[in-house]
């Protein structure tokens, strides 16, 4: 069986646009008739996904897999680091948690993970025509190069040609690219097949003199100037920007609490795309105002974030709003916080054994343990005003919650899930708005409460919208890149598969 060709996208910094460029290449190669898989040896992210077989992986490679038209597979991201504090992360290998590690401890052991990385990569390479590899941060972080397993270190392991991308939108792109190339070793520079200027706004002719000088100084071709593409695609590099965004004023106001360790806030992208729903993230009591719905999202550290809510006054503000009738929704860690008590007897969640009082809005008790619950599932909401809404989603949580009240939904296997009391709703299901049914029922409920007519506010199904956006991304990137040069860098010509 022949082994796949590969191309690797590295960047001059975090946020250079590697994730979306890889998604675009996945889509382009798939459009050209190739079997494609994305790959990132090590990802650091708060937003994760659970595969069909119950393995946890980074969402960036999930998006790239969707762009390629294939099912997400944990082999696409064998190592995932989920920060739980400023100095430590949960280390997930091949979809399963290995435990919490400090940065220093992880750096000392990470080279021992090379066999896991190569096994995952080689397995994918045996099943596909092209592997699109994403780097992390910058390959020129000279303090990290000795034990690199995600940039040039990985490129050497799998013999990958490299495209180096720089972000012109933040300025200094020529210095970014030239400086990065100069800091690389000779054998590393030899792997670079082309430079990409990413996120350009304006007339590309203005860049021509700079491009010529860059090529002269680096002895590398510029294989594309990619415009700033306004596509609505979940992008790891821009997720933090989403938290800062001030959405256009819309008839309905949804306030999501921006917890210090917020995770999987990708759950709420479908709400942002609804014409009637204005979504904003709030950190302070004075920002909360009088929203039509308050959401407590998932978190990587429920206990610490509950303390933060309490100490900063947001807990009291949410309780006042709830008492006045404002609906409140909690997802995963947010659901746990809404209960009466949270117990961490072994300190698995918070580092030290403790028990905290919850917000007391739901009749539940959560006990944290060592075993993480990872599963994909389908469900049907059983409670008004959302009864009948069909959901698909996934669960990622270590806590077990005892419910002394009505369930939010019934899972496909008949198990009750979540909890409801009055206008307070809690669920462990991530991705609950992706099908659109719950979004529509939620919108109708909020419109009725506010006396708004929802007629005419049609929502494109999420999957249809996602595919449209992937095609827009691929069209824009294909037009900007020298695709024959990229195929040549892989030792291919377009059409080799026919």
Annotate each language-model stretch with its function:
Residues 1-322, 327, 344-347, 370-371, ...:
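Flexible phosphate-sensing "switch/lid" loops adjacent to ATP/NTP-binding sites
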Residues 332:
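Catalytic nucleophile serine of serine hydrolases
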Residues 348-375, 381:
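Conserved P-loop NTPase catalytic core
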Residues 339, 343-347, 351:
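Extracellular/periplasmic helix-exit of transmembrane alpha-helices
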């Amino acid at each position: 069986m022949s082994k796949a060709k590969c191309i690797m996208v590295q960047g001059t910094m975090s946020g250079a646009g590697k994730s979306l460029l890889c998604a675009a290449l996945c889509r382009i190669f798939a459009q050209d008739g190739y079997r494609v898989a994305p790959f990132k040896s090590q990802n650091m992210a708060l937003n994760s996904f659970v595969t069909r077989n119950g393995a946890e992986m980074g969402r960036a490679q999930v998006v790239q897999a969707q762009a390629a038209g294939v099912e997400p597979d944990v082999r696409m991201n064998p190592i995932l680091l989920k920060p739980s504090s400023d100095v430590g992360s949960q280390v997930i290998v091949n979809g399963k948690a290995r435990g919490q590690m400090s940065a220093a401890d992880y750096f000392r052991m990470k080279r021992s993970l090379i066999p896991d990385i190569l096994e995952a990569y080689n397995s994918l390479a045996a099943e596909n025509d092209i592997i699109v590899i994403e780097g992390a941060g910058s390959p020129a972080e000279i303090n990290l190069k000795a034990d690199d397993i995600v940039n040039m270190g990985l490129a050497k392991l799998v013999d990958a040609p490299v495209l180096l991308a720089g972000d012109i939108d933040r300025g200094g792109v020529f210095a970014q690219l030239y400086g990065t190339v100069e800091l690389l070793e000779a054998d590393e520079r030899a792997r670079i097949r082309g430079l990409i200027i990413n996120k350009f706004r304006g007339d590309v002719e203005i860049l021509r003199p700079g491009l010529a000088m860059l090529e002269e100084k680096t002895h590398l071709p510029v294989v594309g100037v990619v415009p700033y593409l306004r596509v609505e695609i979940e992008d790891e590099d821009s997720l933090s920007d989403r938290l800062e965004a001030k959405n256009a004023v819309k008839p309905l106001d949804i306030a999501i609490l921006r917890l210090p360790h917020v995770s999987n806030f990708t759950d709420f992208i479908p709400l942002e795309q609804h014409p009637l729903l204005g979504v904003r993230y709030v950190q302070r009591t004075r920002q909360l105002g009088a929203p039509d719905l308050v959401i407590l999202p998932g978190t990587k550290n429920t206990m610490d974030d509950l303390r933060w809510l309490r100490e900063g006054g947001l807990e009291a503000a949410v309780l006042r709003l709830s008492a006045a009738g404002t609906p409140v929704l909690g997802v995963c860690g947010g659901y746990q916080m809404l209960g009466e008590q949270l117990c961490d007897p072994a300190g698995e969640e918070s580092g030290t054994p403790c028990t905290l009082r919850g917000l007391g809005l739901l009749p539940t008790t959560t006990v944290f343990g060592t075993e993480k619950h990872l599963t994909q599932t389908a469900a049907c909401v059983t409670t008004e005003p959302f009864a009948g809404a069909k959901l698909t989603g996934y669960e990622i949580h270590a806590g077990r919650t005892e419910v002394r009240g009505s369930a939010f939904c019934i899972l496909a296997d008949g198990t009750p899930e979540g909890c409801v009391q009055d206008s307070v709703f809690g669920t462990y299901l991530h991705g609950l708005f992706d099908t659109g049914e719950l979004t529509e029922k939620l919108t109708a409920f909020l419109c009725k409460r506010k006396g708004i007519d929802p007629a005419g506010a049609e929502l494109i199904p999420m999957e249809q919208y996602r595919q449209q956006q992937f095609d827009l991304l691929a069209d824009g990137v294909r037009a900007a890149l020298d695709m024959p040069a990229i195929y040549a860098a892989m030792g291919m010509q377009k059409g080799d598969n026919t």
